[in-house]
A protein has these predicted regions:
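Glycine-rich phosphate-binding P-loop
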Residues: 19-44
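N-terminal pre-Walker A segment at the start of P-loop NTPase domains
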Residues: 1-9
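Conserved NTP phosphate-binding and transfer environment spanning the P-loop NTPase/kinase superfamily
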Residues: 93-175
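Pre-Walker A (Motif I) flank of P-loop NTPase domains
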Residues: 11-12, 17-20
Length: 175
């Protein structure tokens, strides 16, 4: 626990649009790499604008029934970029978590069970992507942020309202 009562966790977080992606996983699993990839994707327009919240260690607490993430004070504005070392970058002081990505997840499957696609943190249910060892998480995160689930109605054109490319409607993870 931190001084303000929030949980301190070994994770990274990036705010994309109005929501943060919380990236969890063991040491060396690629948390910082995915965080930086998301920052680059935001700059390129592939996803909504992205800003670092925290890398390596973040604080979690609840706010009005939502999960809030903040950077660890001593690491605020710092990100590890393999091959360059620790670098400074712009950061957000806090964000509401809209998506959790678990790297090196044991329950990663090609067609995951619905219960594998959510997680409960501090009593709050959050959408989740389990990513297995050896799989690239960036395409999965971009897909989660820019597509919707397939409907059983057969009206597949309504699933992606604006078609292809960068014009797909955002999902709850970024709203």
């Amino acid at each position: 626990m931190t001084e303000d009562g929030g949980a301190s966790v070994h994770a990274s977080a990036v705010r994309i649009g109005n929501r943060a992606v919380l990236i969890r996983g063991p040491s060396g699993s690629g948390k910082s790499h995915l965080a930086f990839d998301l920052l680059l994707s935001g700059r390129s327009g592939q996803i909504a604008p992205a800003i670092l919240v925290g890398d390596d260690r973040v604080h979690l607490d609840t706010d009005a029934g939502q999960l809030r993430v903040r950077p660890a004070a001593e690491l605020a504005g710092l990100i590890e970029i393999r091959g360059l070392g620790i670098r400074r970058c712009a950061f957000a002081g806090e964000a509401i978590v809209g998506l959790v990505v678990d790297l090196a997840a044991d329950d990663s499957e090609r067609l995951p069970a619905p219960e594998a696609l959510t997680t409960r943190i501090l009593g709050i249910l959050i959408p989740r992507i389990p990513v297995g060892v050896g799989y690239s998480p960036l395409p999965l995160v971009v897909a989660a942020l820019t597509t919707t689930e397939s409907s059983s109605s057969g009206n597949h054109s309504a699933d992606c309202l604006k078609g292809i490319g960068n014009h797909i409607s955002p999902t709850i993870a970024t709203e």
